[in-house]
Amino acid sequence: VPDLLNLARRVLEQATADEEVEVYVSHGRETSVRVFEGAIEQLETAESAGVGVRVISAGRQGFSYVGALDEPAAKEALIEARDNARFATVDEHAGLASPDGVEPPVLDLWREELVSFPTDDRVALALELERRVRSGDSRIRQVVSSDYVDGFGETAIATSRGIEVTDRQTGCYLFVHAVAGDGDDTQTGFGYSVGRAPGELDLEAAAVDAVDRATRLLGARKARSAKLTAVLDRRVTATLLGILSGTLSGEEVV
């Protein structure tokens, strides 16, 4: 994989004096494993890469994208974006941002361990999670799915106004969905663990959480009606906040 920022710079070198150019370069990969009853049910890996170019000339904007990271293709995207701008409607407010002089924060979001993590080890984590849930309680009747998912992404942005930024991050998670039963009563529950690298995942915590949530309401009975203080589960609270934040987002009125 070429240096993303250097690729963006080389595209910018082709910009003319009467236009503004923004180049976005990205590369990423995602792998997912699902197991069921001790065997692999699904194993997928998807990799993406590309260069996006925006050109602003005489108040007209043109865009183009190419799904490759080689320099000739990236430069061709600039030519296409330039050509597309010729047919765009004039927007007197169109323009690129100027550097504000503020250094972006340095965030520790990348773990090299994940990028080179063997596929066999990914499968092993999903299988072990399923095994722990099954053995966690005799009332567990089935593990619907046990998943391991990871991915990484790298991006670079460079503009003719002098902005240059890069970002890269990794992430992974384990997720398990279990069904528990006692007589005719059946309940479900799930557990998960997230991290920047496989070594940061907590198998035991995910398994225990799934077993607990699947079994704790077995045999439960409806409570009498009353005015009481409601204590919300943290996941329920997060869901409610997610709904509210979406409705209050400025993007809803743009």
Where are these regions (language model features)?
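Active-site bordering "gate/hinge" segments
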Residues: V1-V254
